[in-house]
């Protein structure tokens, strides 16, 4: 079987691809060293790189594509962990990452000038309580309005066939 660069590879008994008999040991060792990762690009400093002994350097200014894999991983992790669960209020969310602490920091950063948004909304809509006046949390509203049985989409004719 031909591997990268036309090199011959053989599959051993354990099912792993290894260097075949046509390669001398020196070429096999050099090939292995060339394929190893010698360093990583880091955005904010050494982090875990110092502990593992892997060489590192900062991402070059103006080269955001070097951080693309990290951002992709972070987005997928966020989708799997946070966006999968609907929280009805903030207390169940608190163990997920210190939300209360972040909210307190945000309020102190604004010098406690955070307005009561639900109260302002209720005073603006005195006759009835519309869907924008959610007090409990972000997932209190139903996904489909039970009072509205109409569709936004025009009806399509099904062809008889």
Curated annotation (Swiss-Prot):
Residues 19-39 have a biased composition (Basic residues). Gene3D superfamilies: Ribonuclease H-like superfamily/Ribonuclease H. Coiled coil: none annotated. Residues 1-47 are annotated as: Disordered. This is Insertion element ISR1 uncharacterized 17 kDa protein A2. The lineage of its organism: Bacteria, Pseudomonadati, Pseudomonadota, Alphaproteobacteria, Hyphomicrobiales. Keywords: Transposable element. GO terms for molecular function: nucleic acid binding. Pfam families: rve_3. PANTHER family: BLR2054 PROTEIN, LOW CALCIUM RESPONSE LOCUS PROTEIN T. Residues 7-16 have a biased composition (Low complexity). InterPro entries: Integrase_cat-core, RNaseH-like_sf, RNaseH_sf.
């Amino acid at each position: 079987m031909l591997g990268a660069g036309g090199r011959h590879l053989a599959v051993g008994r354990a099912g792993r691809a290894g260097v075949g008999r046509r390669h001398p040991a020196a070429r096999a060792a050099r090939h292995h060293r060339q394929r190893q990762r010698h360093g990583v690009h880091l955005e904010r400093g050494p982090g875990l790189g110092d502990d593992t002994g892997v060489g590192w350097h900062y991402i070059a200014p103006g080269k955001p594509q070097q951080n693309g894999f990290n951002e992709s991983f972070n987005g997928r992790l966020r989708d799997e962990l946070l966006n999968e669960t609907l929280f009805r209020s903030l207390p169940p969310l608190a163990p997920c990452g210190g939300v209360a602490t972040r909210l307190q920091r945000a309020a102190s950063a604004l010098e406690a000038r955070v307005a009561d948004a639900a109260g302002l909304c209720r005073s603006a809509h005195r006759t009835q309580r519309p869907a924008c006046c959610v007090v409990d949390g972000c997932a209190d509203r139903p996904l489909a309005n039970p009072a509205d049985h109409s569709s936004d989409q025009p009806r399509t004719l099904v062809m008889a066939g």
